Amino acid sequence: MASLGLLLLLLLTALPPLWSSSLPGLDTAESKATIADLILSALERATVFLEQRLPEINLDGMVGVRVLEEQLKSVREKWAQEPLLQPLSLRVGMLGEKLEAAIQRSLHYLKLSDPKYLREFQLTLQPGFWKLPHAWIHTDASLVYPTFGPQDSFSEERSDVCLVQLLGTGTDSSEPCGLSDLCRSLMTKPGCSGYCLSHQLLFFLWARMRGCTQGPLQQSQDYINLFCANMMDLNRRAEAIGYAYPTRDIFMENIMFCGMGGFSDFYKLRWLEAILSWQKQQEGCFGEPDAEDEELSKAIQYQQHFSRRVKRREKQFPDSRSVAQAGVQWRNLGSLQPLPPGFKQFSCLILPSSWDYRSVPPYLANFYIFLVETGFHHVAHAGLELLISRDPPTSGSQSVGL
């Protein structure tokens, strides 16, 4: 993976951050080691949580683990070259081995819980499928949509059909890089936000990883640029309202996917600090804050619009300590739907096995259960990339506000 000057980007940015970070800067080896230790400690706690809940985690959750495992390989190689980071490099190696073992063990449970889904998407669990960026760019604010459209036509089922066509893993023995007219329309539809937008980005990221270059897939980078510009806009909105809990999952997912897309401006030190603060120290997962913040309460009070949330397979753990938080569907991050009467909130949530929102009563499907991922890959992308980059940014990239 190419190095880039995220350190200089953070120090030389023309625009001041919305909130400054209390983490040490990255201008010395000592400060890099301090932050690296914080990140690794968070990932190690999350790994313990993963190992304890492995039979309950679905394929989507394990895909995130695979992405992190690939990331750790690059991190270990680079940290081994710096004396102060060498001990941490050994920890990275041990963590990577644990994650690889967890992925292999998970295949047994996935074959039992959802064999069809595993057959269709097992390719994304294979080593080498996820290719880390070799060059870095920044989002272009001029590509942000003036308004977001309705998400009614977007669903997990339709998205899965398109992804299977692209991978070529369907039962019809189709070749990879397939693209029907329906999928072309769905995956290039303008005005998407939230999980609709992240599904679109995922489609074109996978197209690039599969080497698909026919038709609209020849313009994969153009669509990736478009989608990540809008995901950056949504992340800034989430930051502006104080990282209200219902926005955190998509906030982290945007960092992961656009980081994989090569957008260095998603790696902000203050965003890393925020993500690290969301981890439950004892449990290791990333879940519901202890108390609702003022911004969330205000947003809920004044919300007017919402749209159905499209999130790849998720579910509560059976021994969670309270009823699921019925969550939010939003067209923008200021539109938050309040909880249905009688619903409480989780303290720890994850991407587990086989729960599907399509099987719940209609009123719950409309609100949809809001769950949050373990954060393995999100913390890695928001943090580890900050620590393995060195090359100074170009003059164009310096103009991007962090």
From Swiss-Prot:
Location in the cell = Secreted
What is the annotated signal peptide range for this record?
1-20
Q: Does the keyword Amino-acid biosynthesis apply?
A: no
- InterPro entries attached here? DUF4735 (IPR031751)
Disulphide bond pairs: none
UniProt lists the family membership as follows: Belongs to the UPF0764 family.
Modification after translation:
Glycosylated.
* Species name: Homo sapiens
Protein name, as recorded: UPF0764 protein C16orf89
Q: Which domain of life is it from?
A: Eukaryota
